Amino acid sequence: MMKKLRMEYREHFLGGTDCRRLGGGLVAGVLILVLSVVSAVPNSKLDSQIVRALSESVCGHQLRHLQGNEGVSEVIPPRLKGEWMSMRCEVRPGPEFVLRRYKFHSDSSFSLHQFFYTDNQCRNPAYSLKIRGTLALGQQSWVTSGATEAEYQVSKVTMVVYDEKFGKTLRAHVNLTCPGFFSSTSNDLELYQRYLIIDWEQEGAYTDCTEAMDFAMHELQIVRNELITEFSTQLAKFVSWEELYLGDIHTVMAQRMYYRPRAYQPPLRKYQANCSFCQFIHNTEEFNPPLLGAKTEYQVILRSEWVSTKCEVRKVHFVTRHLVFHNNFTWEGYFFYYLDPMCQHPVYSIYVKGTHSDGTRSEAVMGGTEFEFVTNQMWITPQNVMQVEKLNNNQDDCARAGSWTINEPQEVTSTNGCAAIGVTLPHTEMELMRMELGVGGKPLLFNGLQSTDEELQGLVVPTSYQSPLMHCAGVNPLIDITVTSQADDENGCGGLAASHYTLSMLLLAAWLVLYLRH
């Protein structure tokens, strides 16, 4: 595949057999421009501020696009009727790898399918749950801005097991809490057989052993419905779809039955006939679980710049993020906090600097890479009057009390952070990360979802992920521009084809700096 792509790239951009001649011209062009730049810049050093401004422009545009959630409109009250499904293999705390297919009906009843897998690509099914019940929407949430509260009742839950090893483990675990619940004499559960977990639909019947399975559907307690509209360059027209956000689940499985959600899980997308992935999930059921195709797994290389893809919800505020990774194990982070789910009303922003370790493959979460992040410098910028008052009332543990003014940043490193917003320095945090190629070929970076238990935040390695960040500047870490095949080298253009992208970028950067200097 790589060879084929290189051949097409060479034919299109390098002119086949003329690649050496064109490549030599390109190198010469770069050298001439670099010499011009060196002669124009004092001490032969590029102006780091110009380079920085150039690298930030795309990222800054994306952040401005998120401020106000351009192209996103809230649907009030939520339109639940219809079929909703996961758009990727979701990683839940635990970890659990899951695909969801939820149906809500006009009579307030629902039929929900949850498919669980033993792998992070949702290719090897372990078991599934089919949940039936009713849901009633309530008032706007006082806890999570933009969410609608709901009350639900589960009437029946059935389970189908697909994996023999998982079935044996589940049977032993459940029978410890509910002796005899799985009453077969064998230690194994029958595969592709429906087991009854809850049944309140039959009069006089009572079956419930959900506590042993850490089962809860409290995600139905808060609901948010959004309509997304964006321009499709492929179709040359605007396209729209709906997304459904349901409540988050506790990161400690044993606490799920007692936790009331305050944030969201990844959104579900409403079924559309022109959505091929939707169609694929739509055609599955408990005896025919969805099996996703294999995807490339990328090594997590922390470099370049990354920015939020949406206005993200937190348990207190909403946030957009901009992370910058350097090649010397240092990093910077910009965090912009808002009062509202459209990220229109700013509260404060934080700028931090620190270091990070090299990554190690996670033993707990398949496909994940673990890091240790240290934050040792911090600046805070209050962006509304209430936040200024809050910071000015500190006990000299968040810069000097009374020194804060709106939209003026202050460093809080000397006071070891800022107690008013609950941050201490230096701060060490265990991280989990993974990378994937998103829609349209954009690299995505997922970093860990911290523990719901505040006392454990940063101390334990996450087992699930936050909303992804999108690559916005710097070298694309998912493009390998150095590896060439033997056949390429025999044609005499392998190394040149591989380095053409790098040379093009050097040429562009040199020209831009020279242009700005004059």
Regions found by a protein language model. Give the residues of each.
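Tryptophan-anchored aromatic micro-motifs
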Residues: 42-99, 111, 135-136, 245, ...
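Cleavable N-terminal signal peptides of Sec/SRP-targeted secreted and luminal proteins
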Residues: 21-40, 503-513
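Mixed-charge, low-complexity intrinsically disordered segments
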Residues: 153-224, 374-431
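Extracellular secreted precursors and ectodomains with disulfide-bonded cysteine-rich loops/domains
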Residues: 57, 87, 120, 176, ...
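N-terminal glycine/threonine-rich, aromatic-flanked beta-hairpin/loop signature
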Residues: 46-50, 67-69, 75-80, 90-174, ...
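N-terminal secretory signal peptides that target proteins for export/translocation
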Residues: 1-21
